[in-house]
């Protein structure tokens, strides 16, 4: 899951599916209840190649800043960015990369990441993006699974790539160039004003990106995203007369989330390129540097994950900076509780704060707050908005698989041209995720309220089963994070001979606070039903999370063994 939001129980109380009434389970199969966006569908030019679509407005923004490297201040206009991307395309082609070939981009956020991804698109190559902090073993698995022929990386990661393949081409973006590697300048030495004249027939169903799922609930699998699926997803967000996410060409969009993750790649980079906005690249998070960049470059859009939202809401350093330029704060990857949202709103009263929901396989965005629309519609606290345009969403019963109506929690399913084509070389996993009618089953539990707003309760596989009762960890985590003495928290199941599983919490204390285990237990017990009460609390220095901000529950469960 890339983006998610947690419902606020005091605002909405969905029907408990443990008791199913006759109107939920009729004697004859009902017509499926399908939910759609409150915004009208739009025409989407998803017959185009991705790069053509993203740079379609090039002539009108050619002299505008496209990329700004936060650490150096170096800026590239749209005209310069497009030209370098074409030179990279030419360089890759000269190195033997052809349509359908896979290249691996192993970089932190940088201009070279953008040049490489878009350059690969121009020749019909496929980019598989990888986490630079992966181990050699993890990189080998992704390299082998994807079949990548070339890796573009930074010299500091080269040692991890030794012995991964004799015929593997390594290109590094910095100087000096390590032994047996080619400098990035090799790709951009084509000094023609109109480089790469080859004609490549790229269809909408051809693969453009090959991200790998996080593996927190299973083995990583290559997710085939086509030119059509990526264009559809971007258009669902930023195209049309009243876009769901209203970006303007004078917007400056903070890119601190890693581009190797689909959330940042899609909702930050591709959305920005399509809109003619400026992308401010930050290669790693550090609160002081982030605040300085927001102030110095007058950032207007900040796409974040909850840990960064917590920093903005709770870190006293924030008060020393002028953040008045920010108009949208997008949050995803995990829930935001109401108190945390209120804290951030006090810090950024002029900004609209909203959440979205998605997953890599869905292209990735399923829903988004309509508060970000050109003609905004207020969204409830805890909601992750309505389903995106040109898509269909339904909620199915966890056992009967029948379609459910309003306020009835079940598994979220999505259908539309934005979803993945398949899992790479894994037809069994593909058919288990996308059914014969084209519905992608997310594995997320949620419901749609009477205003068509979506509330995610939890991951299906992460639900704790206490004597048959379902205990959603995200609900308890939201309560914990809203406590003034708690900086971060995660809840996981611990095996129990009597109950089967019991919820236990890992808690990070706020600076200077000495909250005890009993304090935490009592705080939660006052707010939840008996079977959701915490049985143990462990205090830790930090909560392990993936680059996208998802809690690595398997690491915490391992501590309980």
UniProtKB/Swiss-Prot annotation:
Region (SBD2) residue spans: 356-423
Residues bound to CoA: 284, 467-468
InterPro entries named among the record's database cross-references: AMP-bd_C, AMP-bd_C_sf, AMP-binding_CS, AMP-dep_synth/lig_dom, ANL_N_sf
Obligatory cofactor(s): Mg(2+)
Induction context: By UV irradiation.
Biological pathway: Phytoalexin biosynthesis; 3,4',5-trihydroxystilbene biosynthesis; 3,4',5-trihydroxystilbene from trans-4-coumarate: step 1/2
Entry-linked PROSITE patterns: AMP_BINDING
UniProt keyword terms in alphabetical order: ATP-binding, Ligase, Magnesium, Nucleotide-binding, Phenylpropanoid metabolism
Catalytic activity reported: (E)-4-coumarate + ATP + CoA = (E)-4-coumaroyl-CoA + AMP + diphosphate; (E)-caffeate + ATP + CoA = (E)-caffeoyl-CoA + AMP + diphosphate; (E)-ferulate + ATP + CoA = (E)-feruloyl-CoA + AMP + diphosphate; (E)-4-coumarate + ATP + H(+) = (E)-4-coumaroyl-AMP + diphosphate
GO biological process: phenylpropanoid metabolic process; pollen exine formation
EC top class named in words: ligase
GO molecular function: (E)-caffeate-CoA ligase activity; 4-coumarate-CoA ligase activity; ATP binding; trans-feruloyl-CoA synthase activity
Binding-site residues for ATP, renumbered to this chain: 213-217, 221, 355-356, 360, 444, 459, 550
Region of interest (SBD1), residue spans: 286-355
Tissues/organs with expression: Preferentially expressed in leaves, flowers and siliques.
Family: Belongs to the ATP-dependent AMP-binding enzyme family.
Described purpose of this protein according to its UniProt entry: Produces CoA thioesters of a variety of hydroxy- and methoxy-substituted cinnamic acids, which are used to synthesize several phenylpropanoid-derived compounds, including anthocyanins, flavonoids, isoflavonoids, coumarins, lignin, suberin and wall-bound phenolics. Follows a two-step reaction mechanism, wherein the carboxylate substrate first undergoes adenylation by ATP, followed by a thioesterification in the presence of CoA to yield the final CoA thioesters.
Domain notes: Both substrate-binding domains (SBD1 and SBD2) are involved in the substrate recognition, and are sufficient to confer the substrate specificity.
Protein name: 4-coumarate--CoA ligase 3
Source organism of the structure: Arabidopsis thaliana
Lineage: Eukaryota, Viridiplantae, Streptophyta, Embryophyta, Tracheophyta
Gene for this chain: 4CL3
């Amino acid at each position: 899951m890339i983006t998610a939001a947690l419902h606020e129980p005091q605002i909405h109380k969905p029907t408990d599916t443990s008791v199913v009434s006759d109107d939920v389970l009729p004697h004859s199969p009902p017509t499926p209840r399908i939910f759609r966006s409150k915004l009208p569908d739009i025409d989407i030019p998803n017959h185009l190649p991705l790069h053509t679509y993203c740079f379609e407005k090039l002539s009108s923004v050619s002299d505008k800043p496209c990329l700004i490297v936060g650490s150096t201040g170096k800026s590239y206009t749209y005209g310069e960015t497009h030209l370098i991307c074409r030179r990279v395309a030419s360089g890759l082609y000269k190195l033997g990369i052809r349509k359908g070939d896979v290249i691996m981009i192993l970089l932190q956020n940088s201009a070279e990441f953008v040049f490489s991804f878009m350059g690969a698109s121009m020749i019909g190559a496929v980019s598989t993006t990888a986490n630079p902090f992966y181990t050699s073993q993890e990189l080998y698995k992704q390299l082998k699974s994807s079949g990548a022929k070339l890796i573009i990386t930074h010299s500091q990661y080269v040692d991890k790539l030794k012995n991964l393949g004799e015929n593997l081409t390594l290109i590094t973006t910095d100087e000096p160039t390590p032994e047996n590697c080619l400098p990035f300048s090799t790709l951009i030495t084509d000094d023609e004003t109109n480089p790469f004249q080859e004609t490549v027939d790229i269809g909408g169903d051809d693969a453009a990106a090959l991200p790998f799922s996080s593996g927190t609930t299973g083995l990583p699998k290559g997710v085939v995203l086509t030119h059509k699926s990526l264009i559809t997803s971007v258009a669902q967000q930023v195209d049309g007369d009243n876009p769901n996410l209203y970006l303007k060409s004078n917007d400056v969009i903070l890119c601190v989330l890693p581009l190797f993750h689909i959330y940042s790649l899609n909702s930050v980079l591709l959305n920005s390129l399509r809109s003619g906005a400026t992308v401010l690249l930050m290669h790693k998070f550090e609160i002081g540097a982030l605040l300085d960049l927001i102030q110095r470059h007058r950032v207007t859009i900040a796409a974040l994950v909850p840990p960064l939202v917590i920093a903005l809401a709770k870190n006293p350093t924030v008060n020393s900076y002028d953040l008045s330029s920010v108009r949208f704060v997008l949050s995803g990857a995990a829930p935001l509780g109401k108190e945390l949202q209120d804290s951030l709103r006090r810090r950024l009263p002029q900004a609209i704060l909203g959440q979205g929901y998605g997953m890599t396989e869905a292209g990735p965005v399923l829903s988004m707050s309509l508060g970000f629309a050109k003609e905004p519609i207020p969204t409830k606290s805890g909601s992750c908005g309505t389903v995106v345009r040109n898509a269909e969403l339904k909620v199915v019963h966890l056992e009967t698989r029948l379609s459910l109506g309003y306020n009835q929690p079940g598994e979220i399913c999505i259908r539309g041209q934005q979803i993945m084509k398949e899992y790479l070389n894994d037809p069994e996993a593909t058919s288990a995720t996308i059914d014969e009618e084209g519905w992608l089953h997310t594995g997320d539990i949620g419901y749609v309220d009477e205003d068509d707003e979506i509330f995610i309760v939890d991951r299906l596989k992460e639900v704790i089963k206490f004597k048959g009762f379902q205990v959603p960890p995200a609900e308890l985590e939201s309560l914990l994070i809203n406590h003034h003495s708690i900086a971060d928290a995660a809840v996981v199941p611990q095996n129990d001979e009597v109950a089967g599983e019991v919820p236990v919490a890992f808690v990070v204390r706020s600076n200077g606070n000495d909250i005890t285990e009993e304090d935490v237990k009592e705080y939660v017990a006052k707010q939840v039903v008996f079977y959701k009460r915490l049985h143990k609390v462990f205090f830790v220095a930090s909560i392990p999370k993936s680059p996208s901000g998802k809690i690595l529950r398997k690491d915490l469960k391992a501590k309980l063994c």
